[in-house]
A protein has these predicted regions:
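TRNA-recognition modules of translation machinery and tRNA-sensing kinases, especially anticodon-binding
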Residues: 4-216
Length: 216
């Protein structure tokens, strides 16, 4: 499925060229200060980033999601609780002195709110949203030569999460897909939705849809 294809300029410049020309993002400065995959957002680029985060959070609030600001680090028990450990341990930043991990997505601490908690059916659904910086090592050769904002080691993300009765889980997923679609439609961004094949599914996933938004 796709949408807003009519807004796509076939001769559009890559986003990294636009970011440089408009002085929105400085990739070289990030590489100097930290390393590749840690860009600086500046001026209007920083304002745009902050504005989009607030826009996404506001849309989630209007849809009934409760906002959380979770910790940016988790313990090993939380990593195992959502399947990041041991499956993706090599992709996570590990602070060995304290045996804590930087989160790869807000989903991890948000989901662990309900770890070891017995929920009654009439307590459901639980709907959460959270904005956090996210950290991923992206170890290995895959994505090593991509440019711009792809495969970053640090990036910002607004997450939506629903805890549902198993019999309603796929229906809930469809509702979340429609929520994201409505935001992209409002922003008039060209996008497509991919249903991942079994071999590409995450360790803990039964069904995954990827949204791809045009950026060249």
């Amino acid at each position: 499925r796709s949408g807003n294809a009519e807004t796509l300029d076939r001769h559009a410049k890559p986003h990294w060229e636009l970011a440089e020309e408009m002085d929105l993002i400085d990739f070289e400065l990030g590489a100097k200060v930290t390393g590749a995959g840690f860009p600086f957002y500046k001026g209007k680029g920083a304002k745009l980033q902050r504005g989009l985060i607030q826009f996404f959070l506001q849309k989630a609030d209007e849809a009934g999601y409760t906002e959380y600001i979770p910790p940016l680090m988790i313990n090993a028990e939380s990593g195992f609780g959502t399947g990041q450990l041991p499956d993706k341990e090599g992709q996570m930043y590990h602070v060995t002195a304290d045996d804590l991990y930087l989160i790869p997505t807000a989903e991890v601490p948000a989901t662990n709110i309900f770890r070891d908690v017995l929920l009654q059916e009439n307590d459901l659904p639980k709907t959460l949203t959270a904005y956090t910086p996210c950290f991923r090592r992206e170890a290995g050769s895959y994505g090593a030569h991509v440019r711009g904002l792809n495969r970053l080691h640090q990036f910002d993300k607004v997450e939506i999460l629903r805890v549902e009765h198993p019999s309603k889980s796929y229906e809930a997923l469809d509702g979340m897909v429609e929520h994201v679609k409505s935001i992209l439609e409002e922003l008039k961004l060209p996008y497509r939705i991919l249903k991942l094949c079994t071999g590409d599914l995450g360790f803990t996933s039964a069904l995954t849809y990827d949204f791809e938004v045009f950026s060249t």
